């Protein structure tokens, strides 16, 4: 386990002090009481069954997008296009949710999830091939594909998949395709457990299997750099690792989108927005690019995000201010979070 010096602890507390001071100034400038805002933030994220359930719901896609991020980073590919995979995964999972009939619940849900994951993976195939065989930066290509995904799903929701004569949306998915909601009056559903299982499985595969070792060897160090010199020394083709890593990353993005449609909104509509892909990049880094760390960081961030909604409802403080300040607090807590992750991993 890594040793933590007094300097690490000092930097952590200094960061907490500075971010607390900034938060106090920002909140006071809006004419609100910082203590009251902190109380609402805590209540919205951590107090009461419904609020906790909603916090877990907010954490669900973050666990998957953070895991998708860390896998691509570990193979040396900087995938910024997870949002695009979420969009196409959500669209086609929603389509499969009403298109296929006469299926049992488990079969229908599984089919929808597999379709969402497959489409999400295929969405990342082009930037992976462009990077490996043409040297095109995956950062640029995946960012472009994010915009292409938005335009594509908008076209499909307005055209071939449109079922609502008023709004650009698909038909509602069948009950056999729905993920079960755990608590009434909450969007928390069984998708959370799927996300946690997937992240734990990713941890096992990356750290305990030969396949995971070959993937990790595709990058130089924790954050990979493609092509990897280390991989070539071992005789492992880094090209293959890069492509497979991008496909897995896209599949997890598609899974996150599929769970959102199957477990919460129940259909795909044009105004559906996904920003969890970008959040997943920050959370994946905060979790030290380890799946277990991604789970922990996602739970914290999900609670803060839900608490931000509660603060926005109760006060005049913008939710964006709360999330920005809270994320900075999480960054200040990075040393302690790293310690928790190391304790769980060893």
Regions found by a protein language model. Name each.
Residues 1-14, 331, 342:
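Transmembrane alpha-helical segments of polytopic membrane transport and secretion proteins
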Residues 2-10, 73-81, 103-106, 110-168, ...:
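Short loop segments and helix-boundary regions at transmembrane helix junctions
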Residues 11-27:
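N-terminal signal-anchor transmembrane alpha helix
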Residues 25-30, 40, 45-100, 113, ...:
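Single transmembrane alpha-helix segments in multi-pass membrane proteins
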Residues 49, 138, 142-208, 319:
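Transmembrane helix-bundle core of multi-pass membrane transporters
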Residues 101, 183-267, 291-292:
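Helix-loop-helix "hairpin" substructures at the membrane interface of multi-pass membrane proteins
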Residues 246-324:
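Transmembrane alpha-helical segments in multi-pass inner-membrane proteins
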Residues 328-335:
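Conserved small/polar residues in nucleotide/adenosyl-binding loops
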């Amino acid at each position: 386990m890594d040793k933590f010096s007094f300097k690490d602890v000092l930097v952590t507390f200094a960061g907490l002090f500075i971010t607390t001071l900034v938060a106090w100034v920002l909140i006071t400038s809006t004419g609100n009481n910082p203590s009251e805002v902190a109380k609402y933030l805590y209540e919205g994220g951590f107090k009461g069954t419904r609020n906790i359930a909603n916090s877990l719901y907010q954490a669900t896609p973050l666990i998957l997008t953070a895991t998708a991020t860390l896998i691509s980073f570990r193979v040396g590919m900087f995938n910024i296009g997870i949002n695009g995979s979420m969009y196409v995964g959500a669209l086609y999972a929603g389509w499969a949710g009403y298109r296929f009939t006469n299926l049992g619940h488990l079969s229908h849900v599984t089919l929808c999830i597999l379709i969402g994951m497959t489409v999400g993976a295929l969405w990342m195939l082009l930037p992976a091939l462009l990077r490996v065989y043409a040297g095109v930066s995956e950062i640029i290509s995946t960012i472009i594909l994010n915009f292409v995904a938005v335009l594509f799903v908008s076209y499909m929701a307005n055209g071939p998949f449109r079922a609502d004569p008023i709004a650009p949306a698909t038909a509602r998915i069948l009950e056999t395709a729905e993920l079960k909601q755990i608590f009434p009056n909450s969007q928390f559903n069984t998708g959370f457990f799927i996300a946690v299982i997937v992240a734990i499985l990713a941890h096992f595969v990356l750290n305990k299997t030969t396949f995971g070792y070959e993937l990790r060897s595709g990058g130089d160090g924790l954050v990979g750099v493609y092509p990897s010199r280390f991989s070539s020394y071992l005789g492992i083709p880094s090209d293959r690792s890069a492509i497979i890593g991008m496909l897995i990353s896209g599949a997890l993005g598609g899974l996150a989108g599929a769970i959102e449609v199957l477990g919460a909104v129940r259909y795909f509509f044009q105004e559906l927005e996904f920003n969890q892909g970008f959040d997943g990049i920050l959370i994946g880094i905060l979790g030290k690019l380890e799946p277990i760390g991604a789970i922990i960081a996602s739970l914290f961030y999900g609670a803060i995000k839900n608490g931000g909604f509660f603060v926005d409802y109760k006060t005049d403080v913008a939710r964006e201010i709360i999330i920005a300040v809270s994320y900075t607090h999480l960054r200040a807590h990075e040393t302690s979070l790293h310690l928790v992750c190391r304790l769980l991993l060893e």
